[in-house]
């Protein structure tokens, strides 16, 4: 289901390949060590690519992180997430304790 171009994108040195099937690639970011699944869905679905994420190998499950129209866009989501993690996560709100 993945085109030659998509396979080359997923083989980028930015990632470490964990597992590959016809329907998904399981990869690890070399920058953060986070694990990702890029899954190709049926063409009839609105978003043909779903992105799943987990922080460590020991975490028993992945959570859905996002969807995209292309594998390239999904990989940009991962790189954006890595930048967010590396630059330090900012609190959504702060509580002042008196």
State the predicted function of each range:
Residues 33-63:
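Short aromatic-glycine-(Arg/Gly/Cys) micro-motifs in beta-strand/loop hairpins
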Residues 1-33, 58-60, 91-98:
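Negatively charged, low-complexity tracts enriched in Asp/Glu with abundant Ser/Thr
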Residues 4-7, 53-98:
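Mixed-charge, Lys/Arg-enriched low-complexity segments
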């Amino acid at each position: 289901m993945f085109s030659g171009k998509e396979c080359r994108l997923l083989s980028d040195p930015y990632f470490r390949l964990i597992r590959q099937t016809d329907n998904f690639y399981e990869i690890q970011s070399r920058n953060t060590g986070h694990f990702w699944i890029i899954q190709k869905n049926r063409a009839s679905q609105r978003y043909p690519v779903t992105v799943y994420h987990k922080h460590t190998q020991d975490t028993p499950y992945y959570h859905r992180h996002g969807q995209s129209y292309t594998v390239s866009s999904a990989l940009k989501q991962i790189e954006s997430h890595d930048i967010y993690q590396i630059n330090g996560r900012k609190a959504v709100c702060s509580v002042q304790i008196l």
